[in-house]
Design a protein with these regions (language model features):
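Cation-handling catalytic/transport regions enriched in His/Asp/Glu
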Residues: 1-233
Length: 233
């Protein structure tokens, strides 16, 4: 955890000292719950405070590289929420989905780029790039496919009435096949994978924002690399 903390803080501070200062408060003032304990739900998210209270970060840290990326992602949310509470009114501090996911994915990109610059082993760099490409595919193409499944599910419900698990699985496989286009073999067990995605019940219509955020961050970071210091207010 201490290593993950250092990785995130070094990257955020290197990008902008003010970002590093705010991120440090999340660690120093215990605004993050990271231990995996009995009865704790899985996943990760950031939660708004109010004008008078700070945001919180919820995650389950097990020491993997993906957990570090998740921490960087949620810290992006956390900083966005903190600054919104500081600069905006109570009625304007809550951001739309697309803007929220842009902030979090940008936080991931900051940490990834910082690690890439510090890594001298070409094979490790290649492994990191491969993982990043895989992550980008999941964030853009897969989330769009999931969004199309969700749209198809609601459309079918309106037109056909109550849907069976078999019908939902059929819609799931159809939209997944549109994405993979025969590049992978999808076994029968994969038909049920729609059932583990909590967004369909907990945050309907959400997942397209991940794809939007990823694409906008790629454009924004490219602009940052071209303009450097003038990019940062």
């Amino acid at each position: 955890w201490d290593e993950a903390k250092k990785i995130v803080l070094d990257a955020y501070t290197g990008f902008n000292p003010r970002m590093g200062e705010i991120a440090s408060r999340f660690f120093d003032e215990n605004w993050i719950h990271a231990p995996v304990i009995q009865g704790k739900q899985g996943g990760a998210y950031a939660s708004y405070g109010t004008k008078k209270s700070h945001p919180w970060i919820f995650t389950n840290y097990t020491g993997t590289a993906n957990d570090v990326a998740t921490l960087a992602h949620e810290m992006g949310h956390g900083l966005h929420m903190f600054l919104a509470g500081e600069k905006q009114t109570l009625f304007s501090m809550y951001t739309p989905l697309t803007t929220a996911e842009t902030a979090s994915v940008f936080g991931e990109m900051i940490v990834f780029q910082d690690l890439m610059k510090k890594e001298s082993d070409k094979e490790v760099q290649l492994a990191m790039l491969t993982e990043k490409i895989d992550s980008t595919f999941a964030t853009v193409f897969r989330q769009i496919a999931i969004n199309r499944f969700e749209d198809a599910m609601h459309t079918a419900r309106r037109e056909e009435g109550e849907l069976t698990t078999e019908r939902l699985s059929e819609l799931w496989m159809s939209t997944q096949k549109d994405m993979f286009q025969g590049s992978v073999t999808m076994r029968d067990e994969y038909k049920q994978w729609w059932s583990y995605i909590w967004h369909f019940l907990g945050a309907p219509g959400y997942v397209y924002a991940y794809a939007f955020g990823e694409l906008l961050v790629l454009a924004l970071y490219n602009l940052y690399e071209q303009t450097c210091d003038s990019f940062i207010p």
